Curated annotation (Swiss-Prot):
It is found in: Preautophagosomal structure membrane; Endoplasmic reticulum membrane. This is Autophagy-related protein 2. Residues 30-121 form the Chorein N-terminal domain. It catalyses: a 1,2-diacyl-sn-glycero-3-phosphocholine(in) = a 1,2-diacyl-sn-glycero-3-phosphocholine(out); a 1,2-diacyl-sn-glycero-3-phospho-L-serine(in) = a 1,2-diacyl-sn-glycero-3-phospho-L-serine(out); a 1,2-diacyl-sn-glycero-3-phosphoethanolamine(in) = a 1,2-diacyl-sn-glycero-3-phosphoethanolamine(out). Residues 397-406 have a biased composition (Polar residues). Lipid transfer protein required for autophagosome completion and peroxisome degradation. Tethers the edge of the isolation membrane (IM) to the endoplasmic reticulum (ER) and mediates direct lipid transfer from ER to IM for IM expansion. ATG2 binds to the ER exit site (ERES), which is the membrane source for autophagosome formation, using basic residues in its N-terminal region (NR) and to the expanding edge of the IM through its C-terminal region. The latter binding is assisted by an ATG18-PtdIns3P interaction.
Length: 1958
């Protein structure tokens, strides 16, 4: 483009008069024509500039040219290629120039243009215009162009004679001049000496030529130029648009307005450009631009004008080109270096051509083809236009203007009545003659002042569409900016730099946007807009947005070069390679220009919405009083609203505001009559926007803003939607980069690699350092954002757009204090870094307020602030910040579609919140209003919400395409949008939140404190997958109730440390994705909670209060629609749930090691399913206060160290929960697999029950008022129907109802006995109690004869009677359905719980968990010891013992623990009591007891393990090793009793209130066992199933061992009664007395009442009512008992407890049946158990005593033998009665007799052999001296009587853990005869070998011993061993052999032995 001529910038003085140079006339005419052609020939028609066609008076200096046609192709060559703008036509009506001859140097040169018309077209560039950059000429300086033109004229236009003549005239004129024309160093002048130095005879200096003199003359003439342009009209035609943009300028004047004076600084020259009547119209396209209007010639006006063409600037690639002193050089010197001349003409450089382009680049006219450059003109391109011009010319030589009326367009922009004035004042310092000055002292000073009045513009919707279309066309080529351009070369200019000061003043700027689409159809639209443009204060009657800017002052200052003698270092541009940097340039980099600065001040800026009826609403407003409205909080609040300020607020839409804009500003505090409103703030006088930037350096633009208030009314967006919808179709993504631009290489210019370039590139800074230069720094004291949402319509169907004045929720204010925003420039290097920071925002504090509709003050509920410093710290606080960065993302898309991912990083040091219930309610209303507003505003379906608002994020408004990615992902795939992603990372160091929750009883507020540390939020969009992910993590949190005493509710279990905890407490991940094929939205929510404790302290009212606190109000969030599919996953790990009862001091902890739950909620689903899997679930309890929690690797150890005891554990739990979302909302819970484990001691289990019961009081049953039952008028005697003699009648023995009595008692009725014996015991008979048929499965091993079943039942003869069977029709269909007796109601309930497979193990430990229990036992032991010592003293003194000694020497604690004298020996056998015992025996017993106590309790001290006990005082407490009967008081390591239930299935149904049945529980267990783990017990299973009864019946397949049904019946009084039914399969019991005593002691334990932590509340004072059983039915239970007694309680015998007689006998196979019992009206479980015991015990004693006695061990053998004898006699008789075959009966009887007799004989023999073996082993121990060593191990803990039977008199209780476990010798029996013989041989050989070794070892021992009796003792000790060892082996061999034979004959007994023995 053009460069500013030198005379515009450096001519700061009045030109002196040039010497009178007389030129020849012919030379003058030829020179004039040549100059015009050289200057204007390329831009206009060339023939019009011929000397013959120019109307001129050369003598007067007047030249006039009419009807000039602009050469469009030449103008288009100067338009940049990326700009899609082309000139289609242009005309100049008249061009007039006046040269004031002969006073050329004093009078001005006047040039005027009249009626300039230019038509441009905005469209996509054509292929022809794309190559115009290659033909653009190079740029040359104006001085160079003038010099070249002068030289060309002299050497080509003139011949030698004319040139000689011209040189002589110039020489003569210079000699005659008395004034040195170059004293002031005129541009183009040459430094000559005084006039006297030039003489006619002296030749000109060698360096002065005629061309230089001629160039100086031209420069002096142009310095006096005055230019004027009138009637300028520029039209812009936009492609595919109906309207044309027309810019009209009335007049442009350029003149010299300097005064003839010189100040002390030097001479100054003032020039001015005045532009008048600027307007912009939108003209309809029907009115085409006039073809070529040739108006009538007008008179020449004397006014001085100037041209704007001379003010055009260069492209601006080199900053020095903008200075207007560029051309001030010596015209004798050429600026072209050899390198520049040698460069190709098509190479793009920073130099561009101007209007005085050098003739060296153009061919001469005289040369062939000189006119090829101007062939294509505007007329030739438009044939129609050319024909019209020819027609006009044929009519008249001077055509008349057209008179056709033209429709006027709609005015859009106006500059008002004031002119745009540009003043330029150039001042050059005075230089005295002969004084040598430096360049710095000779620098000119230029001052430019631009004054603009009021600019007013009004945009209609169609205008906005027009401009957007134009911008869209320009945007289409914005992506081509990265096409590499030519490299800039550093300018090597030695001219001094001008000191420039430029100031621009704009009075006001108004922009009005009419958003009402119907406004364009108004009849008075034209007049209204014209009136408003003329006077902006005139209102526009259409709804519109008005932007106002007042008093804009912009100032630019440039001090010039600091040292122009050295070339300035040019910073490489992004398209310049570092290879262009030479070594010498880097050395002078510090001598560049001093930084220039730019300053912009704006008085005021505002944006208002003007609605109809005079309503005005603010949108953007600068308010200096905002920052003084309240004081910022300096410390975090602790309670209440301390630290949270308040501010006045009001709804700006509440009232009509028609006054000034100050009505919406904040009123300063303290203003008033009494308060002296003199608090006049000075902020109003200052600018609201202040911008300052130092140019030419890396400093950023600093923008200071006053307090800014932004009003966001969502109804405004609703009113703008029609406009946005009309504009949205114009917004479309840019087209891909054309191939012709993509083919341009990144470095199209070859560069020479030199050593200097390599060194310079190495010393250059890295690209990343330059890429992060700060571009702008914006600072604002306070920014307030006020948001309001209009109330939704009353009915959803109403979707009308209203004014939005009604408000339902409230207003949200966001105040940002101390805002500092920094924007980085990342486009300075060619290679951008991988990650670059784009912007960074910091602020001191941000407060979020909320004010409801009725409130006049707003209170903040959220504050973002820096961390509060610790006391005494003076560190600079870390401010909250938001950083915006971008980095490339990996993508599989094409390279042209990949965009950078935007990263937003937010660092918030601290967040404080104070949330009240009105605020929560208001925010919920606000959120609901926004949601419903979106539904209403975007409900018509014409466009999606993202489409209307898409232009807001477009590049027109500074947005980014990437910000829209994944915002609405259910649209068609868009490559440009998908390729861009976004990541948001939020880091919060601390959160302190206070919740003020109203209490349910309206007694005030409950205050909750929520604190969290190290909170992180991360959001990431995956464009390729159409997925958005959100992650939330909290490392530490604390949620407490601080209303009175702080109670922690939720928090990390143990203190947070960096080494112990790595996982966050809360982790949330939300992923939203959309399937592009199916357009289904899917949401995945994952919640992970770990290492936390949730506590429920003494009440749960706060849960209801928080639920009520967060509950949405009625009518809120009712229209929300879920996504198509929602997946929810919840994971809990290392979680603890602390349950603190309301009254007791203890607590329960539920531990969760791992829980995972998953659910899916499809859109429109009728039910939801939740699947949960658990592992490691446990329950612990503590009796009192617990100790502090310490870090441990195991979660259970953490609580155990604090004093908790393990009680329950769930190893595996898998459940499935299904809930109906419609209808009645039924809930179904299926537990597919569960494994439960209970471990407890007597005291901890009781405490757990008490705490659980107390905690259950927190959930009282909501019972309705009792319904009053109707009363009868008369009484009824309920005993009228009672038969008093009913029980006195003897029952009929032979009746069918009493058939079961045959086995209850001894048979005595022969008739009935004969009938019963007809049925074989192997026949599948009817159950004697239930009437049910039980199948009998037999094997050949059980002694059944082959073919027995085929021959009939028990050999009976079946007779078939003749005759046909008559079948009754419909009989089978009419049979009634038999209801299962265990399923009263099969209808599932509203809540159905089903357990499919579960197992339960209960481990009962010996000892006690609580220190309180152990301490009570220890204290009682000491008390009993003191009493015994006192009694011993009394007995020693001779006093007699009385009956009171029994109470004094014993005590019973907790109804379970006996402390006192052991009743054994003579004392135990005495039936008289201690009071009548012998004193010696009593004293011996007391001494033995005291010695035992001394040994057990006084032996040593020990320290309990950490955490054993409750409370801190129990930790690390030393106490004595107290033992009770040889056992420790702490919990035993191993369980003593194990209760196992497996195969559990349960159905639980809860029915709605309208049903008569309230609940139903059906419980079944496939296996039930009780294992005996007591070390002194040799039996394995205390209770198990019975393999087969005495009749051979075995258990059915898949039969349940235990079945219980419990049904709850709802009464009219809303009370429930229970119905219980239970059935248990036959049980097999192996009862050891130690195990029985342990169970009695365990379950009879009654802990002392716990001290209540607080008085019972009113609702908990009433005791929990006991269960009331309306009906109880227990089906018969068959038992088979083995019992081994070990001691007898003689005290119980003396008290009359006959059950103690069982301890005298050893029972084996004793059978009994607990009869079928039906009860009614039983209250409580304890009453139920007592009643059952009272009914069953007498029945067993009365009716089944024979069966029980037959189980005594010696009697049992005789009974079995007697049964064989009976079979030998009775079976032949029975068989004879049946079929008369006596032989078969004899055979069966004989087999039974032989088998039973043989079994008993072998059994008795084995027992005798085992007993003999034990006696021999004990004798060996006594004789061999090993009685105290291993006799226990050999005997294996058993004592036998003389008959070899296990003795029941073994004294002592259950052993301690230190004792060795006893193993019975009957365990591990051989299974067959073969194994028996092998075991016998092995035993016999082992003992014989031992005897042999003993005999062989005697001689050696005799030899070694010395003395008289040594050898004798050795022989005596060896003889018994040698004799007894073979005997022991023999007895053991006999026992093994007999046991093997017995097990071979009776396999069923072998299986029972595996269950019996350990």
């Amino acid at each position: 483009m053009f460069s500013l001529p030198s005379f515009l910038t450096t001519f700061s003085f009045t030109l002196p008069s040039l010497p009178s140079i007389s030129l020849p006339a012919n030379i003058q005419r030829r020179f004039l024509s040549y100059v015009l052609k050289r200057t204007l020939g390329r831009f206009v028609s060339h023939q019009a500039l011929d000397a013959e066609r120019i109307q001129a008076q050369v003598s007067e200096g007047w030249v006039e040219i009419e009807n000039l046609e602009i050469e469009c192709s030449e103008i288009n060559n100067y338009i940049p290629p990326p700009l899609p703008l082309s000139l289609t036509s242009g005309t100049i009506n008249k061009l007039t120039a006046k040269l004031p001859f002969p006073n050329l140097w004093s009078d001005p040169l006047q040039v005027s243009l009249d009626t300039l018309t230019l038509d441009f077209t905005l469209s996509s560039p054509s292929p022809l215009s794309r190559g115009r950059a290659a033909t653009r000429p190079e740029h040359h300086d104006l001085a160079e162009s003038v010099t070249s033109a002068a030289d060309d004229f002299l050497h080509h236009e003139l011949d030698a004679y004319e040139e000689k003549e011209l040189e002589g005239s110039i020489r003569q004129s210079l000699i005659l001049s008395q004034t040195d024309p170059f004293i002031s160093d005129v541009p183009g002048g040459f430094p000559l000496g005084s006039p006297g130095e030039i003489s006619p005879g002296r030749p000109l200096p060698a360096n002065m030529e005629s061309t230089t003199v001629l160039a100086g003359m031209v420069e002096r003439i142009l310095a006096r130029l005055e230019f004027r342009v009138e009637k300028i009209k520029i039209r812009l035609v936009i492609e595919d648009e109906e309207d044309v943009v027309e810019l009209t300028v009335g007049r442009i004047r350029y003149a010299d307005e300097s005064e003839a004076q010189t100040n002390d600084d030097g001479k100054s020259t003032t020039r001015a450009i005045r532009i008048s009547n600027i307007s912009l119209d939108i003209v309809p396209s029907q009115r085409k631009p006039p073809s070529l209007v040739i108006p009538q010639r007008q008179s020449l006006e004397p006014s001085v004008s100037s041209s704007t063409s001379t003010a055009s600037t260069s492209s601006g690639n080199d900053y020095s080109d903008m200075f207007m002193s560029q051309a001030v050089v010596d015209l004798r010197q050429s600026l072209l270096t050899p390198e520049q001349i040698s460069e190709p003409a098509n190479e793009q450089t920073v130099h561009e051509s101007n209007m005085f382009y050098s003739a060296l680049s153009q061919p001469n006219e005289s040369e062939p083809g000189a006119s090829t450059g101007i062939k294509r003109s505007g007329i030739s391109q438009n044939p129609k236009l050319a024909d019209e011009i020819e027609e006009e010319r044929s009519r008249s030589e001077t055509p008349t203007p057209e008179t056709k009326p033209q429709p006027s367009g709609i005015p859009v922009l106006s500059f008002g009545q004031e002119d745009v004035v540009l003043h330029m004042r150039t001042t050059r310092p005075l230089i005295s003659a002969g004084h040598q000055t430096s360049f710095n002292d000779n620098k000119p000073t230029v001052e430019m002042n631009i004054t603009i009045g009021t600019i007013t513009t009004v945009l209609l919707p169609s205008h906005l569409k027009l401009f957007i279309s134009a911008l869209q066309t320009l945007q289409a080529l914005c992506q081509k900016d990265d096409v590499p351009a030519a490299k800039d070369k550093p300018a090597q200019s030695t001219s001094p730099q001008t000191r420039l000061t430029a100031t621009t003043k704009l009075k006001a700027f108004y922009v009005s946007l009419v958003y009402d689409l119907s406004a364009e159809t108004s009849l008075n639209l034209h007049s209204t807009m014209a009136s408003h443009l003329t006077r902006p204060t005139n209102p526009i009657p259409y709804p519109h947005l008005r932007f106002r800017l007042d008093t804009l002052v912009a100032s630019y200052q440039s001090p010039g070069h600091s040292n122009p003698s050295r070339p300035a270092f040019t910073r490489p541009t992004p398209n310049m390679s570092t290879a262009n940097l030479r070594r010498k340039s880097s050395g002078h980099a510090r001598f560049g220009s001093l930084p220039s600065n730019l300053t912009v001040n704006v008085g005021d800026i505002s944006l208002f919405e003007w609605m109809g009826e005079g309503m005005i609403a603010p949108v953007i407003l600068f308010d200096p009083g905002l920052k003084h409205q309240y004081d910022l909080p300096s410390a975090p609040p602790h309670k209440g609203q301390a630290g949270f300020p308040e501010c006045e607020c009001r709804d700006w839409r509440e009232e009509k505001k028609t006054g000034s804009e100050k009505a919406w500003r904040v009123r300063p505090r303290g203003r008033g009559i009494l308060k002296g409103g003199a608090r006049a703030t000075t902020e109003d006088e200052g600018p609201v926007v202040h911008v300052r930037q130092d140019l030419g350096s890396d400093s950023a633009a600093v923008i200071n803003l006053q307090s800014l208030h932004v009003f966001v009314d969502l109804s405004l967006i609703e009113r703008l939607l029609p406009l946005l919808r009309s504009v949205t179709p114009l917004i479309h993504p840019p087209e891909p980069t054309p191939a012709w631009l993509q083919s341009v290489p990144s470095q199209s210019i070859s560069e020479e690699i030199t050593p200097e370039s390599i060194i310079s590139s190495l010393s250059a800074p890295p690209p990343t350092a330059r890429g992060k230069k700060m571009k702008a720094d914006i600072r604002c004291d306070l920014v307030r954002l006020s948001v309001r949402c209009p109330a939704p319509p009353p009915e959803p169907a109403e979707r009308q757009i209203g004014d939005g004045r009604q408000l339902r929720s409230g207003i949200v204010f966001v105040d940002v204090h101390g805002l500092k925003s920094r924007f980085m420039d990342t486009s300075r290097t060619g290679t951008r870094p991988a990650s670059s920071e784009v912007a960074n925002v910091e602020f001191e504090q941000t407060l979020i307020f909320f004010a409801s509709v009725s409130q006049h003050y707003a209170y903040p509920f959220l504050i973002f602030a820096p961390l509060s410093p610790e006391p005494g710290e003076e560190d600079i606080p870390l401010l909250p910040s938001i950083s915006l960065s971008s980095f490339p993302q990996a993508s599989s898309l094409p390279a042209s579609s990949i965009a950078k991912t935007t990263l937003v990083t937010c660092k918030m040091p601290a967040i404080r919140a104070s949330v009240h219930h009105p605020t929560v309610t208001g925010l919920q209303y606000f959120a609901d209003d926004v949601t419903r507003w979106l539904d209403v505003a975007f409900a018509d379906g014409s466009a999606k919400p993202r489409d209307e608002l898409k232009m807001i994020g477009s590049r027109f408004f500074g947005g980014s395409k990437g910000s829209e990615a994944s915002s609405e992902i259910d649209e068609p795939y868009d490559v440009e949008e998908v390729a861009a992603g976004m990541k948001v990372e939020i880091e919060i160091s601390e959160i302190d939140m206070g919740l003020y929750v109203p209490r349910l009883d309206a007694s005030g507020e409950r205050v909750f404190s929520f604190k969290a540390n190290d909170l992180g939020v991360r959001m990431e969009t995956h464009p390729e997958e159409n997925e958005t992910a959100l992650e939330l993590s909290i490392m530490d949190l604390d949620f407490s109730d601080v209303s009175s005493t702080p109670l922690r509710i939720l928090g990390r279990t143990t203190p947070f440390t960096l080494t112990s905890h790595q996982a966050p407490v809360v982790y949330l991940r939300f992923v939203s994705s959309t399937d592009l094929r199916t357009t289904l939205k899917e949401s995945n929510i994952s919640v992970a909670l770990s290492h936390f404790t949730f506590a429920v302290h003494k009440e749960i009212a706060w849960l209801h209060e928080i639920a009520q606190f967060a509950k949405p109000p009625k009518g809120v969030f009712e229209n929300l629609s879920p996504t198509d599919l929602t997946r929810l996953s919840i994971n809990l790990s290392s979680a603890s749930f602390l349950l603190v009862p309301p009254n007791l001091p203890g607590s329960i902890v539920i531990l969760v090691r791992e829980v995972e739950g998953k659910t899916e909620i499809p859109k429109g689903a009728t039910d939801s399913v939740l699947e949960v899997g658990m592992s490691g679930l446990g329950a612990l309890a503590v009796e009192g206060e617990s100790g502090p929690l310490e870090v441990s690797s195991d979660l259970a150890d953490v609580w155990k160290k604090a004093g908790y005891a393990q009680l329950a554990e769930v190893m595996v739990l898998e459940l499935r929960l299904m809930r109906e979302l419609v209808a009645a909302g039924e809930v179904s819970l299926d537990i597919t697999q569960a494994q439960f484990k209970v471990t407890a001691c007597a005291d901890s289990l009781a405490t757990f029950a008490e705490i659980a019961t107390d905690f259950g009081r927190l959930f009282p049953n909501k019972k309705e008022e009792h319904v009053k039952l109707p009363s009868m008028g008369q009484s009824i005697n309920v005993f009228d129907s009672l038969d008093e003699n009913a029980f006195n009648l003897l029952p009929e023995i032979v009746s069918h109802s009493d058939t079961d009595m045959i086995e209850d008692d001894l048979p005595h009725n022969l008739d009935y006995l004969d009938h019963a014996t007809r049925i074989s015991k192997h026949y599948p008979s009817m159950d004697r109690t239930t009437g049910e048929n039980l199948r009998a499965w037999h094997t050949p091993e059980e002694g059944l004869e082959e073919g027995e079943w085929e021959n009939g039942e028990s050999g009976e003869t079946i007779r078939a009677f003749g005759g046909e069977i008559e079948e009754e029709e419909g009989y089978w269909e009419g049979l009634p359905i038999l209801n299962d007796v265990y399923s009263a109601d099969q209808k599932p309930g509203k809540i159905h719980i089903r357990v499919l497979d579960a197992s339960l193990k209960i481990f009962l430990h010996d000892g006690y968990d609580w220190p309180r229990t152990r301490k009570a036992i220890e204290d009682e032991v000491r008390a009993v010891r003191r009493r015994l010592e006192r009694i011993r003293q009394l007995l020693a003194s001779g006093q007699k013992a009385d009956e009171s000694i029994e109470n004094a020497t014993s005590s019973v604690l907790f109804n379970s623990i006996y402390i006192g004298l052991e009743q054994k020996g003579e004392m135990g056998l005495s039936t008289m009591g201690m009071g009548k015992m012998d004193e010696k025996a009593l004293m011996a017993a007391i001494d033995e007891e005291l010695d035992g106590m001394e040994t057990e309790s006084g032996s040593s001290w020990q320290t309990l393990p950490a955490g054993v006990g409750a409370g801190p005082s129990a930790v690390h407490q030393a106490h004595k090793k107290t033992r009770l009967k040889g056992k420790r008081l702490v919990r035993s390591k191993k369980a003593q009793i194990e209760i196992t239930l497996s195969g559990i299935k349960t159905d639980v149904d809860l029915y709605p209130t309208e049903e008569s049945t309230s609940s139903r529980v059906h419980f079944t267990a496939k296996e039930m066992e009780i294992l005996d783990h007591i070390k002194t017990s040799t039996w394995k299973k205390f209770l198990t199933e019975m393999k087969a009864d005495n009749r051979g019946n075995i258990r059915e397949t898949d039969a349940d061992m235990l079945r219980i049904e419990l049904v709850g019946v709802r009464l009219k009084e809303d009370e429930e009664e229970l119905r219980l039914r239970a059935k248990i399969l036959p049980l097999r019991l192996h009862v050891d007395q130690d195990a029985l005593d342990f169970l009695k002691r365990f379950f009879s334990f009654k802990a002392p009442p716990m001290t209540s932590a607080r008085p019972l509340a009113q609702h908990t004072t009433s005791s929990t009512p006991d269960l009331y059983f309306q009906h109880v039915e227990i089906f018969p239970i068959q038992l088979k008992l083995d019992y081994k007694p070990k001691r007898v309680d003689f005290r119980a015998l003396r008290e009359g407890k006959t059950i103690e007689l069982m301890n005298f006998f050893h029972f084996e196979g004793a059978e009994m049946t607990l009869r079928h019992i039906t009860l009614s009206g039983i209250t409580g479980l304890e009453r139920l158990g007592t009643t059952l015991q009272d009914l069953w015990t007498p029945d067993v004693k009365a009716n089944q005593l024979a069966d029980v006695i037959s189980g005594v061990s010696p009697i049992r053998s005789m009974v079995n033998v007697g049964s064989g004898v009976a079979d030998l006699i009775l079976l032949p008789i029975e068989q004879y009665r049946k079929d008369g075959r006596i032989a078969k009966g004899v055979q069966r009887g004989t087999n039974s007799f032989v088998k039973s007799t043989a079994l008993e004989v072998m059994k008795l023999g084995a027992r005798l052999a085992t007993g003999t073996q034990v006696i021999l082993e004990r004798a060996e121990g006594v004789l061999g001296g090993k009685s105290g060593e291993d006799v226990v191990g050999q005997v294996q803990g058993l004592s036998t009587n003389a008959f070899g039977v296990d003795s029941g008199m073994l004294e002592g209780g259950s052993s301690s853990e230190d004792e060795q476990e006893a193993i019975s010798r009957y365990a591990d029996q051989p299974e067959s005869m073969k194994e028996g013989v092998q075991a016998a041989y092995k035993s016999l050989s082992k003992n014989v070998n031992a005897a042999a070794q003993t005999i062989l070892a005697v001689p050696m021992e005799v030899y070694e011993r010395s003395g008289d009796d040594g050898p004798l003792k050795a022989v005596i000790r060896a003889v018994p061993i040698a004799v007894l060892k073979p005997m022991i082996g023999t007895t053991e061999a006999v026992s093994k052999t007999l046991l093997g034979m017995r097990n071979s004959l009776d396999p069923s007994a072998r299986r029972e032995l595996d269950d019996k023995y350990k």
